[in-house]
């Protein structure tokens, strides 16, 4: 793939002062720049220590020059790295010297973009570079590294290859009707289709776990008024983020707190108490609470363990059952264990539902059980060598592919329509291609790489 022949340069290390700072150059002028600044042509892939000089020969700094001729470099072009002292003034003088020699200032993410355009890495791998830099936990960093090494891309490529094989079979049968292949009676197409759907479902589930580790899990605290929801928010946040009183309906709007548990990002949402009310303001709060419940990754249903209705908490608010997307996303919190006499404990029922008895206000007893549970929900220390990082756009593409395959299967089994199945298979393949960049618009590429750091 052709890329612009301009030479680009940027400071590749973080802003501020440090022991070492790096100026990176990529493009056809990288070798000329190296020779002009160091006074000699560096031997490829060897570290050369010496002075860095300006146009008059005055020394700007001393450091190490590394030269990588293309295509054996990160970007696939000639690349020069000048590693000097990490002061911002020194680095800026060195960068200005590179620009003076014909380079232009790189856009954010342009080095990674050129690596993608030169087939040095695919789009998912390029995004993994940014994810690795921005990782907020060791687990997220490990997942990002696996994506950078191609684990996620390989899973997508395997799915794509199976789709291509299926498309070849289906479209050949359509193009050569004299063969009289009956898709349903044959059974081969349906078997292949179900195999791809099952594998795609597994990848989607694993990608969802990777996205939680990267972006953070949205945890909604829901329940009746005065169940202790705001107290639980404050306990998790470690500060008085929400007003707590004995008056029912104190919380009338959605409150959001961003917290970390052992480096794992969580977006905790406190909501208005769920009850019938004639108060217009509180009614709006209840509606917003139900909306937040529908969008949550995990729901903490808080009940007052001292209340009689605590024995059947899911019957407290029928609309809650209608609103929650998946019962498996709900964790029951029996609060006020210090008053009810409940033992501080985490229990898992036969059907997998988790109940935690704790006290949000009495020294936060049981809070550590909740923290460990939330970490487990995010996949903390539960990953394997096949785990990888993923982004929301990856999940959207995987869901689009899954929906297309589901629709195609319906077309095949209900109408025997091979032509319509072929179109659904094409759309599924295109959706998967958007993940790795096999099918990507210029606008999409621009949005992705512009979110990177300058110098990456």
UniProtKB/Swiss-Prot annotation:
UniProt family annotation: Belongs to the TRAFAC class TrmE-Era-EngA-EngB-Septin-like GTPase superfamily. TrmE GTPase family.
Entry binding sites for (6S)-5-formyl-5,6,7,8-tetrahydrofolate: 24, 81, 120, 456
Record's keyword terms, sorted: Cytoplasm, GTP-binding, Hydrolase, Magnesium, Metal-binding, Nucleotide-binding, Potassium, tRNA processing
Gene that this polypeptide is encoded by: mnmE
NCBIfam families: mnmE_trmE_thdF (TIGR00450), PRK05291.1-3 (NF003661), small_GTP (TIGR00231)
Stored InterPro entries: G_TrmE (IPR031168), GTP-bd (IPR006073), GTP-bd_TrmE_N (IPR018948), GTPase_MnmE (IPR004520), MnmE_dom2 (IPR027368), MnmE_helical (IPR025867), P-loop_NTPase (IPR027417), Small_GTP-bd (IPR005225)
A GO term from the CC aspect: cytosol
UniProt GO MF annotations: GTP binding; GTPase activity; metal ion binding
Organism placement in taxonomy: Bacteria, Pseudomonadati, Pseudomonadota, Gammaproteobacteria, Pseudomonadales
GO biological process, alphabetically ordered: tRNA methylation; tRNA wobble uridine modification
Protein purpose: Exhibits a very high intrinsic GTPase hydrolysis rate. Involved in the addition of a carboxymethylaminomethyl (cmnm) group at the wobble position (U34) of certain tRNAs, forming tRNA-cmnm(5)s(2)U34.
Amino acids binding Mg(2+): 230, 251
Cellular localisation: Cytoplasm
Residue positions binding K(+): 226, 245, 247, 250
Record's subunit section: Homodimer. Heterotetramer of two MnmE and two MnmG subunits.
Enzyme Commission number, as recorded: 3.6.-.-
Cofactor note (record): Binds 1 potassium ion per subunit.
Cofactor(s) essential for the protein: K(+)
Pfam family name, one: MnmE_helical
Organism this protein belongs to: Pseudomonas syringae pv. tomato (strain ATCC BAA-871 / DC3000)
Name of the protein described by the UniProt record: tRNA modification GTPase MnmE
Binding site for GTP: 226-231, 245-251, 270-273, 335-338, 359-361
């Amino acid at each position: 793939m052709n890329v612009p022949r301009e030479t680009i340069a940027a400071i590749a290390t973080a802003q501020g002062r440090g022991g070492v700072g790096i100026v990176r150059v990529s493009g056809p002028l990288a070798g000329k720049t190296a020779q002009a600044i160091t006074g000699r042509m560096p031997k490829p892939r060897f570290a050369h220590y010496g002075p860095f000089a300006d146009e008059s020969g005055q020394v700007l700094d001393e450091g190490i020059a590394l030269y990588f001729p293309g295509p054996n470099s990160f970007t696939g072009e000639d690349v020069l790295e000048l590693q000097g002292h990490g002061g911002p003034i020194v680095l800026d003088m060195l960068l200005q010297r590179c620009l003076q020699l014909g380079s232009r200032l790189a856009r954010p993410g342009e080095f990674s973009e050129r690596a993608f355009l030169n087939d040095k890495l695919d789009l998912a791998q390029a995004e993994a570079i940014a994810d690795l830099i921005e990782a907020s936990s060791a687990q997220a960093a490990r997942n990002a590294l696996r994506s950078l090494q191609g684990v996620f891309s390989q899973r997508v490529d395997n799915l794509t290859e199976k789709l291509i094989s299926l498309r070849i079979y289906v479209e050949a049968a359509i193009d050569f009707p004299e063969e009289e292949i009956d898709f349903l009676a044959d059974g081969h197409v349906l078997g292949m289709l179900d195999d791809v759907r099952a594998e795609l479902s597994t990848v989607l589930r694993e990608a969802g776990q990777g996205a939680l580790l990267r972006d953070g899990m949205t945890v909604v605290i829901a329940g009746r008024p005065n169940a202790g929801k705001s107290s639980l928010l404050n306990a998790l946040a470690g500060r008085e983020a929400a007003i707590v009183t004995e008056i029912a309906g104190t919380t009338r709007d959605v409150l959001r707190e961003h917290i970390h548990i052992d480096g794992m990002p969580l977006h905790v949402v406190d909501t208005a108490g769920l009850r019938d009310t004639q108060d217009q303001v509180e009614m709006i709060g209840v509606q917003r609470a139900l909306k937040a419940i529908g969008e949550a990754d995990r729901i903490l249903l808080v009940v007052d363990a001292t209340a009689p209705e605590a024995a059947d908490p899911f019957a407290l608010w029928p609309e809650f059952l209608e609103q929650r997307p998946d019962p498996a996303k709900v964790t029951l919190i029996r609060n006020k264990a210090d008053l009810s006499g409940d033992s501080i404990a985490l229990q898992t029922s036969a059907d997998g539902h988790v109940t935690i008895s704790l006290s949000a206000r009495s020294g936060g007893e049981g809070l550590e059980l909740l923290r460990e549970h939330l970490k487990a929900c995010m996949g903390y220390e539960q990953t394997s060598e096949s785990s990888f990082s993923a982004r929301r756009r990856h999940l959207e593409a995987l869901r689009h592919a899954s929906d297309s395959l589901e629709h195609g299967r319906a077309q095949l089994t209900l109408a025997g329509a091979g032509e319509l199945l072929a179109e659904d298979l094409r759309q599924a393949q295109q959706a998967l291609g958007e993940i790795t960049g096999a099918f990507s618009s210029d606008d999409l590429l621009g949005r992705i790489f512009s979110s990177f750091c300058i110098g990456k």
